[in-house]
Amino acid sequence: MWRRLAFVVSNAAVLVLFPATSVPAAQSGTAEEAKAMLERAVAAVKKDKVKALDLFNTGDSRFRDRDLYVFCANVSDGVLTAHPTIRGKTLQDLEGKHGAEFGQEIMQEATEGMIKETTYWWPRAGSDQPLEKTTFYTKVGDQICGVGYYQK
């Protein structure tokens, strides 16, 4: 009995001294998860673009998870057709902190059938503190779609 009590007490001490050290990582999506979400998004756009854009914009759990989400823009004019907060703005006008013109880069470099990536500084939702973010993106028909993840 004393061994069991000692075990419980020592584990409780560990939890108090080192509370939930893995929680921040669990709150953020990973590179692998971002790329997998983009691949699901590409398949959805190819199957039914209108339905896919609706799913992206309504926050369907296959396309929005923690800080991962799908965004899409028209190839022709760069207007964002899917984004949680800035739908209707133009992709090429987006700049990260420190002047990185990542939106313009995405517009120029997106290629059908190839997933590319770009890194820039962008605040998390609800914050104005910029963090390093990498976005995977590709061209799908008349759309450019991407999913980004934060480095930390």
Question: What kind of region is each of these model predictions?
Answer:
Residues 2-152:
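N-terminal membrane-sensor/transducer module of prokaryotic signaling receptors
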